[in-house]
Structures are given as C-alpha cells and as structure tokens.
Regions:
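Conserved short loop/turn motifs at secondary-structure junctions
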Residues: 53, 110-119
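Short catalytic-site patches enriched in acidic/histidine residues
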Residues: 67, 77-79, 119-167
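A composition/biophysics-driven feature that prefers long, compositionally simple stretches
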Residues: 1-105
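A structural signal for alpha-helical segments
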Residues: 87-90, 117, 121
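A broad, low-specificity signal for short, low-complexity segments enriched in glycine/proline
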Residues: 9-15, 111, 133-139
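Active-site pocket-lining segments that scaffold enzyme catalytic pockets across diverse folds
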Residues: 99-109, 119-127
Length: 167
C-alpha cells in the first residue's frame, strides 16, 4: 500500500486527521457529489477498488463506477468482517473497559430510578457517571458519543428511540 488517506466532511474539521492514520482530505458539500469527486481525485482510475457492498447503497456505487469507469470494483464485505473479528490485546482491553463503564452506567441508572423522576433525568445521571469514569480511565482523551437509552412506555418499541420527560 502506497498511501493511506481518509476523506472527510468539512463539518468534522481537523478531527479525522488528528484521530486517524495517514493523511486526510477535507471536502465541502457546497456542491453535489463533492465527496465522490474527492474520491476520484485520490484513486487511480485503472485499478481494483475494494468496497463493502453491505455498506454502500446502489446509487453511490453507481456514482463511483461512473467516475472511475476503468476501475474494477470488488466486494470485500466478508473478508473485512472476518478481519474485524480478530482483536488485538489493546482492543480486548478497550472492550473490557467499555463493559465495566457500561456497568457503572447501569448501576447509576438503577440508583436514579424513583417515583416521579423523569426518564431524561435518570438517563443524565447514568451518562454523567459513565463520562466521569471514561475521563478517569483515559485522561487526556476526547470523550464523545456516550449516552444512556432509558425509555418507557411506547418508546420501548425500538432501541434508538429518544428519552422523554415522562415520569
């Protein structure tokens, strides 16, 4: 492999470069299909391109095929998933720590439950406990995407439903 480069949206600023490996190209979405144009500028139009077909919709695949007509596209979904199943010691430690942090959040959730307590307050208590624990375990890190799903009533019909002010 000659180079490693990520292509990310302008809204993410420099974070993909800071948190990633290799170089990073930032594109704007001011014009339609700028992402695909950025991909075209980075990929030789005569090679073999691996794509996870289970992660790209038909329309976007067609855009890539149009922009790179001399390239061969290959489905790498299965081999990529097999590679993801192999974990390094560092990844296993992260998974263990994540499970322990989730247990702390679950205990905080149970601790906050009470008659008349809105579900959003219970979720906030749980999330705060987890964020504090993550900050303790990983000082100097960026903390993002940590939250608690704590739904009741009709919102229990789906995993990604929002918390509410229901008591």
């Amino acid at each position: 492999q000659d180079k490693l480069k990520s292509i990310s949206a302008n809204i993410d600023g420099g974070q993909p470069w800071r948190r990633g490996f290799g170089d990073n190209i930032v594109y704007t979405d001011w014009k339609k299909n700028n992402y695909f144009k950025a991909v075209k500028n980075e990929i030789k139009n005569n090679g073999r391109i691996g794509i996870e077909y289970d992660h790209i919709n038909f329309e976007n695949l067609k855009k890539l095929q149009y922009l790179l007509p001399d390239s061969e596209f290959a489905d790498i979904s299965k081999i990529t998933m097999r590679q993801r199943m192999v974990k390094s010691d560092e990844e296993i430690d992260l998974i263990r720590n994540g499970s322990q942090v989730a247990d702390i959040g679950g205990a905080a959730c149970v601790e906050a439950i009470g008659e008349g307590v809105p579900e959003h307050e219970i979720a906030l208590h749980s999330t705060s406990a987890m964020v504090r624990e993550i900050a303790h375990r990983y000082p100097g890190s960026d903390i993002m995407d940590t939250w608690t799903w704590f739904q009741s009533g009709i919102n229990t019909d789906g995993a990604h439903n929002p918390v509410s002010t229901r008591k």
